[in-house]
């Protein structure tokens, strides 16, 4: 997982974990409630289509607002227990829908009727929130016609093995999903990007197989596309604008399974690590409360423990376990309070460790000075802010314990908002 040369001074190297063939996946105990986040703010309750007590069928599209098309898909049957506003990281506003699960609820027949015809419209109407995180906007070809489809069967962070499990044990679903994606996008070229240690035995999948380095962060989209396509995407440019769609392998598998079974497949593979580092793989519906998943493993959260969704390098810290497993929640990591590394308040000592380890060759020591001062435009124009691949290595090696990665995420988010507002008002 971690190596440093003993013969010369060089940056440490981190390696993705390889899934062992014996790794089992367990079904978590069924939760009696579900939490769903709709990507639309709850500003006016009088515009709601739904209310507390409404019955919900399994697989039903829930469209909360009269004047917005945003929707979620119910992973289980039951009734709406509450509808409330929720503020996520960086102040993003969502609508939270709490469901009370009922064992004898009905299944919705809407997708079963639509699944007879594979089309982009069907995918966009039903597959938002699919496990793995399918970006229906990116694959729609709205930016540019999709010429190349890259199915990423690589891990998003250290300690996670969810993608490898899906590739190895849901291969038939992956194959079906690739066929569906090829049909709806019209892509002429389909590539399956896999870790170098797992490339064997993938020849029967309907795609070109390309191996990706097992040195972190080779799986980040920018670095991965350079390795498998031999071309670079300009900094700050979405792959879709270059005619490239990147789809996580779990999303491809869920897509294939959905059309095969004629139901929206909402089962998510999650890697869970407890305070001792013990690793478990679970299959749970999207929307399962994190608290319920941890309880099924007898993991207790104490004061000042850290709960991370997404992995140790790029994950986000959750302030509560009353939070759902989301489509992109590949990993849940629980850290004991005594093992938590706290951010420091010291200024940069200009040691250069962050510059040496940066895979994108960003002058991080200069960049962080402008980010701390809130000079985001200068950071983007003069110090390659958008060249950053969001790997978190700079924060990991910083002796001053500066939360560099968090500064970078905040800057990118703020600049994206401001530039979108400028374009809208132009």
Which positions does each model-derived feature cover?
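Short, well-structured beta-strand-loop connectors
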Residues: 50-64, 80-82
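N-terminal, Lys/Arg-enriched amphipathic/low-complexity engagement segments
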Residues: 1-49
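Acidic low-complexity segments
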Residues: 87-148
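Hydrophobic alpha-helical positions that pack around
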Residues: 130, 140-142, 161-163, 184-290, ...
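Short, conserved beta-turn/loop elements at beta-strand boundaries and strand-helix junctions
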Residues: 82-88, 300
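Phosphate-binding glycine-rich loops and their immediate beta-loop-alpha structural context
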Residues: 128-193, 362, 366, 375-379
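Ferredoxin-type iron-sulfur electron-transfer modules in oxidoreductases and energy-metabolism complexes
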Residues: 330-345, 355, 359-426
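Active-site gating/interface segments in enzymes
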Residues: 218-219, 223-229, 260-262, 298-349
């Amino acid at each position: 997982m971690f190596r440093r040369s003993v013969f010369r001074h060089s940056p440490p190297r981190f390696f993705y974990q390889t899934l062992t063939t014996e790794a089992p996946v367990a079904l978590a105990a069924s939760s009696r409630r579900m939490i769903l986040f709709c990507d639309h703010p709850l500003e006016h309750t009088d515009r709601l289509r739904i209310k507390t007590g409404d019955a919900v069928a399994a697989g039903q599209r829930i469209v909360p607002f009269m004047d917005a098309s945003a929707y979620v898909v119910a992973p289980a049957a039951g009734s709406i227990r509450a509808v409330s506003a929720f503020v996520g990281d960086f102040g993003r506003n969502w609508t939270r829908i709490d469901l009370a699960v009922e064992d004898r609820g009905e299944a919705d027949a809407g997708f079963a009727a639509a699944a007879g015809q594979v089309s982009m419209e069907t995918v966009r109407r039903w597959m938002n929130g699919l496990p793995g995180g399918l970006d229906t906007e990116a694959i729609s070809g709205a930016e540019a016609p999709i010429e190349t489809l890259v199915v990423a069967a690589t891990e998003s962070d250290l300690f996670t093995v969810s993608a490898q499990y899906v590739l190895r044990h849901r291969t038939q679903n992956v194959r079906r999903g690739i066929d569906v994606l090829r049909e709806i996008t019209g892509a002429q070229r389909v590539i399956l990007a896999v870790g170098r240690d797992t490339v064997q035995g993938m020849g029967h999948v309907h795609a070109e197989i390309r191996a990706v380095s097992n040195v972190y962060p080779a799986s980040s989209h920018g670095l991965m596309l350079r390795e498998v396509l031999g071309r670079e995407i300009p900094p700050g440019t979405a792959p879709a604008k270059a005619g490239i769609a990147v789809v996580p392998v779990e999303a491809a598998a869920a897509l294939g399974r959905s059309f095969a079974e004629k139901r929206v497949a909402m089962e998510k593979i999650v890697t869970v690590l407890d305070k001792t580092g013990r690793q478990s793989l679970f299959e749970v519906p999207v929307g399962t409360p994190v608290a319920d998943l941890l309880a099924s493993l007898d993991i207790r959260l104490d004061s000042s423990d850290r709960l991370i969704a997404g992995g140790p390098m790029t994950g986000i810290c959750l302030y509560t376990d009353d939070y759902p497993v989301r489509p992109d929640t590949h990993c849940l990591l629980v850290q004991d309070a005594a093992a938590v590394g706290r951010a420091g308040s010291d200024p940069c000592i200009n040691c250069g460790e962050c510059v040496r380890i940066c895979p994108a060759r960003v002058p991080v020591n200069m960049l962080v000075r402008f980010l701390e001062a809130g000079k985001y435009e200068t950071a983007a124009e003069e110090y390659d802010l958008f060249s950053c691949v969001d790997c978190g290595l700079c924060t990991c090696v910083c002796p001053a314990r500066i939360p560099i990665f968090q500064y970078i995420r905040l800057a990118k988010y703020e600049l994206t908002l401001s530039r979108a507002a400028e374009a809208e008002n132009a």
